[in-house]
Amino acid sequence: MHIADQSGAAAAQRKPLYAQLYVQVLVAITVGILLGHYYPSIGESMKPLGDAFIKLVKMIIAPVIFLTVATGIAGMSDLQKVGRVAGKAMLYFLTFSTLALIIGLVVANVVQPGAGFNIDPATLDASTVNTYAAKAHDQSVTGFLMNIIPGTIVGAFADGDILQVLFFSVLFGIALALVGDKGAPVLNFLQALMAPMFKLVSVLMKAAPIGAFGAMAFTIGKYGIGSVINLAMLVGTFYATSLLFVFVVLGAVCRYNGFSILSLLRYIKEELLLVLGTSSSEAALPSLMEKMEKAGAKRSVVGLVIPTGYSFNLDGTNIYMTLAALFIAQATNIHLSMGDQILLLLVAMLSSKGAAGITGAGFITLAATLSVVPSVPVAGMALILGVDRFMSECRALTNFIGNAVATLVVARWEGELDEAKLARALAGTADDSLPADIVPAE
């Protein structure tokens, strides 16, 4: 009997509510908020729990990407598909990333969240954002592109650099496909290795409530809910704009491609709560790759689109950058002409590519953008430093949802989406087992 048969039978029996991961994570987040609010010092001391969980997940990201991409590409009958999938993915990323930037710009002009602050730029303390500005100055388009090529294969895996691992995985998968039958033993080994690797993912996810509790307790304990009140207009505008983007823009994309955004959100609810609790979309990357494959997207598409999307398809970060930049300009009474705003948009399009899916990366990317746009003072970032952590959750969630949608859409464009399997998955009736080619027989 196959392991898949056993797991499929087990999946048919619904777990009680308290045993479901999304409920456990939701309870953990709530307890973390309460602890951080009423006992801030204890809440701050919970930080290692969140950090440890993220390190555990990052530990397996590189091997999961390598196995998924290498086996997916090596199993392709037509290697030209690799180029087509990559091209369609980049077209999607460029289109919707630019749209997210434009939406942030338009909303900031209409709502004017920074109006009325009347802050003199000369009084701003730039020392609080010097660290972020220094990191931002290290970024350049050439440096970013060169960094995709790893110095050594071992170094790429040791550092956990997603794009470097993806670059090597694609080349290895192509080479494995080109050697034909001689590569069959290697391909079989890698496919067999995927079973314990995905099992490890599910084991680590059981610790998600602990990680979410620690991260949320630290955030509330250190920054306090009260820090949001003074900048509630900015935070509220950002959350509302992100919701608009997810449910209207991405919702329309989903509907056009034959599925519902609400059904997709229900399907990935455990991962969404994990991202909410940790403020890191990377925390749920391995689990998302597994779920997208179970939802009917071919492994080759999943392996290419998701890791690439974590650098090139950051819708939440893009909305945040134009919205935050205009907020700073409005708060310091700096008028930005249409030309200035177009320059801001173009610079943001470049600097947003390569922003990692980790906590705080959006703030560094904003610093990189403002350092090139002379009209808006980088020191103005001090105004939003206190609430950036509370916007980080929304950035990460929007980025995560955007990549889930992108994977299914690109798979459908390429004819690599099993729509019947997707319908079952979104309806909650799918067999929650490993793909057939990575399930060992007895």
From Swiss-Prot:
Keywords on record: Cell inner membrane, Cell membrane, Membrane, Symport, Transmembrane, Transmembrane helix, Transport
GO MF: fumarate transmembrane transporter activity; malate:proton symporter activity; succinate transmembrane transporter activity
InterPro entries, per the entry: C4_dicarb_transport, Na-dicarboxylate_symporter, Na-dicarboxylate_symporter_CS, Na:dicarbo_symporter_sf
Pfam family, one: SDF
Bilayer topology: Multi-pass membrane protein
One GO term of the biological process aspect: L-aspartate transmembrane transport
PANTHER family on file: AEROBIC C4-DICARBOXYLATE TRANSPORT PROTEIN, PROTON/GLUTAMATE-ASPARTATE SYMPORTER
Main location group: membrane
Similarity remark: Belongs to the dicarboxylate/amino acid:cation symporter (DAACS) (TC 2.A.23) family.
Protein name (Swiss-Prot/TrEMBL): C4-dicarboxylate transport protein 2
Gene label: dctA2
Cellular localisation: Cell inner membrane
Keyword match Transport: yes
Signal sequence, renumbered to the chain: none
Free-text function comment from the UniProt entry: Responsible for the transport of dicarboxylates such as succinate, fumarate, and malate from the periplasm across the membrane. This transport system plays an important role in the energy supply of rhizobium-legume symbionts.
GO cellular component, as recorded: plasma membrane
TM region positions: 20-39, 52-74, 89-111, 141-158, 162-179, 200-221, 231-253, 342-364, 368-387
Entry keyword DNA damage: no
Gene3D superfamilies assigned: Sodium:dicarboxylate symporter (1.10.3860.10)
NCBIfam families: PRK01663.1, PRK13027.1
